[in-house]
Regions:
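N-terminal edge beta-strand
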Residues: 41-70
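Non-cytosolic beta-sheet module surface loops
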Residues: 55, 75-77, 128
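Beta-strand cores of secreted/periplasmic/IMS beta-sandwich domains, seen most often
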Residues: 61-81, 85-86, 110-124
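Extracellular/periplasmic metallocenter environments
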Residues: 25-28, 43, 57, 104-140
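Bacterial N-terminal signal peptides that target proteins for export
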Residues: 2-14
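C-terminal motif of bacterial Sec signal peptides marking the signal peptidase cleavage site
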Residues: 20-23
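Bacterial Sec signal peptide processing site at the extreme N-terminus
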Residues: 26-39
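Histidine- and aromatic-enriched segments that form or immediately flank copper-ligand environments
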Residues: 80-106
Length: 140
């Protein structure tokens, strides 16, 4: 009687390799997997970052500001929903840095003053719709 020896499946091995390579690879622009390219970010211009809300999403997945410089977030709500922008040290929301006033659109806008921040990554979201979120990069 012959004992059956386990044989590795070529298909299974290739599938496993594809999963590992996919999980470890970054974006085509060199950004790590799961991160956002800063090319897509809203940036400070003359002390103001403009970001909008429409179709339950922010117009940019991230914002970029300069360390040590206060700035304003000019927020435009383009839809008939209640939205705001709030800023935290991280996604746990344990340390709130700025809670923006909620506004109802369409075509409503407000300016939020943000005090100077240290270089680093911060988290922002809409308190009413937490899936609307992004990263604020503060660069030295």
């Amino acid at each position: 009687m012959r004992s059956a020896s386990p044989r590795p499946s070529v298909t299974g091995a290739l599938f496993s390799l594809m999963l590992v390579l996919g999980a470890c690879s970054g974006g085509a622009d060199g950004t790590p997997a799961g991160s956002t390219s800063r090319d897509d970010c809203a940036r400070v211009e003359d002390g103001v970052i403009t970001i909008t809300a429409d179709d339950l999403a922010f117009s940019a997945p991230c914002m970029v500001a300069t360390a040590g410089e206060a700035f304003t977030i000019h927020f435009e709500n383009l839809e008939a929903q209640v939205h705001n922008v709030s800023l935290y040290t991280d996604s746990s929301k344990g340390n709130e840095l700025m809670r923006g006033e909620t506004i109802t659109g369409p075509d409503a806008e407000v300016d939020y003053a943000v005090e100077a921040l240290e270089a680093g990554e911060y988290y922002f979201d809409c308190m009413v719709h937490p899936a609307m979120s992004g990263t604020l990069f503060v660069e030295a």
